[in-house]
Regions:
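Hydrophobic alpha-helix position signal
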Residues: 39, 78-79, 100, 150, ...
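Short, electropositive, low-hydrophobicity segments enriched in small/polar residues
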Residues: 16-18, 23, 47, 95, ...
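Generic structural signal for short, solvent-exposed loop/turn connectors between secondary structure elements
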Residues: 49-58, 83, 95, 139-142, ...
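Gly/Ser-rich oxyanion-binding loop with an adjacent helix/lid
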Residues: 65-135
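Helix-rich "cap/lid" substructures immediately adjacent to catalytic or cofactor-binding pockets
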Residues: 2-90, 168
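Positively charged, low-complexity/disordered segments
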Residues: 194-199
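Alpha/beta catalytic cores of group-transfer enzymes, especially the acyltransferase/condensing modules
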Residues: 13-15, 103-193
Length: 199
């Protein structure tokens, strides 16, 4: 990348999975320190949650800080192991908080407390398992059409990620009907359920 700039963009919630970051944790001492620092700030063992099979990882109050920690640890590993020096950081949704830490705008401990509270509030708003999200992808997707198709369902457009992707969110029981309607009206669309306990 001669004369170019290096940008790192962090994803949002829904990117979590059991075992995330374990390889970096085991191979990079700096990553272990980040997980330890996060555990001290949050009062629970972040590494154990990320590397084990605990379903709490899919609860937004735990998923959000765990994702931020893993993203910062991965950044540390990339910098340490490959000597990459990012010029710019960005993020999508929850990833914006990680970008603030990476850019040195806010300390990790502060962001972890913020996203834990953010996730807890989301979790309190809707009982576990009653909310769902799906990404809908289609060239030049029309948000108004989506809203009209789903108007009588407890589902709405939650995010407009790009001209070609939106996220719908609402009651999980209504999600299959929403997907059926979208498939019938917009045959060329793709949709993917997102791994988020709350929407």
């Amino acid at each position: 990348m001669a004369n170019g700039k290096t940008a790192i963009v962090f994803p949002g919630q829904g990117s979590q999975r059991h075992g995330m970051g374990k390889d970096f944790y085991e191979s990079t001492p700096g990553c272990r320190r980040i997980y330890e620092q996060a555990s001290d700030a949050l009062g629970w063992d972040v590494a154990a949650l990320c590397f084990g099979e605990d379903e709490k990882l899919n609860l937004t109050a735990y998923a959000q800080p765990s994702i931020v920690v893993t993203e910062i640890a991965m950044l540390k590993a990339i910098i340490d192991q490959y000597g990459i020096t990012p010029d710019v950081f960005g993020g999508h949704s929850l990833g914006e908080y990680t970008a603030l830490v990476a850019a040195g705008v806010l300390p990790l401990e502060t962001v972890l407390r913020i996203v834990h509270i953010r996730g807890s509030l989301m979790q309190e708003a809707v009982p576990v398992g009653e909310g769902g999200m799906a990404a809908v992808i289609r060239k030049d997707i029309d948000t108004r059409t989506i809203r009209e198709l789903l108007a009588d369902l407890p589902i709405d457009v939650a995010n407009i990620n790009s001209p070609n992707q939106i996220v719908i969110s609402g009651r999980s029981k209504a999600m299959p009907e929403a997907e059926r309607r979208l498939a019938k009206a917009l045959a060329d669309r793709k949709s993917t359920r997102l791994n988020s306990s709350h929407s």
